Amino acid sequence: MDIKQLREKSADELKAHLTDLRKEQFSLRMQQVTGQLPKTHETRRVRREIARVKHLLGSTK
């Protein structure tokens, strides 16, 4: 998701999105450990999106 789209969301929506991203990150990590992850770039994308959401949550306080 683009940073502009994230800025339009409320803090509660960002927290919910962060929870979903962390679940996705855990799932991707488990797939990577078991050797079942065909698209390894997805872990990087999720990690960066988590950083974007955390940045926005920190700046709104």
Curated annotation (Swiss-Prot):
Keyword Ribosomal protein attributed: yes
CDD domains, alphabetized: Ribosomal_L29_HIP (cd00427)
Molecular function terms from GO: structural constituent of ribosome
GO cellular component: cytosolic large ribosomal subunit
Keyword Ribonucleoprotein found: yes
Top-rank taxon, per record: Bacteria
Family: Belongs to the universal ribosomal protein uL29 family.
Protein name: Large ribosomal subunit protein uL29
InterPro entries associated with the record: Ribosomal_protein_uL29, Ribosomal_uL29, Ribosomal_uL29_sf
Biological process, per Gene Ontology: translation
SUPFAM superfamilies, alphabetized: Ribosomal protein L29 (L29p)
Keyword annotations: Ribonucleoprotein, Ribosomal protein
Coiled coil (UniProt feature): none
